[in-house]
């Protein structure tokens, strides 16, 4: 049995928990689809999820996490901020754009109030340099995972 476990492993598990307490959640349009009766049963819910995962999530969310991680590993804060700006400008739905920004700012706020041993200063540099911008959740997450 291990007596000493790296605390950062638990933090990584915690931030990947769907119930991570960032005090904000969002349906990302599912509510509207239900209200308009476009998602009304198991089959239409499956199609909605499949479409969302194979388009928006894959080419926007996952790609931005990957790019933020890569830029952070190269200490390229300007590149990270550029990804945030591109994401903010490319989300056509105001509702989804604001959700991403709120999730990002609350994610950052929660992490800053947590005692974390970072392996580098990339996340804290990103937070300081993105104060005048609107950080997105996926970019903040990617930079945090690299840090």
What are these regions (language model features)?
Residues 6, 17, 41-43, 84, ...:
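Acidic-enriched, low-complexity/disordered segments with a strong bias for Aspartate over Glutamate
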Residues 10-77:
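Glycine/small-residue-rich interface belts in oligomeric ring/scaffold proteins
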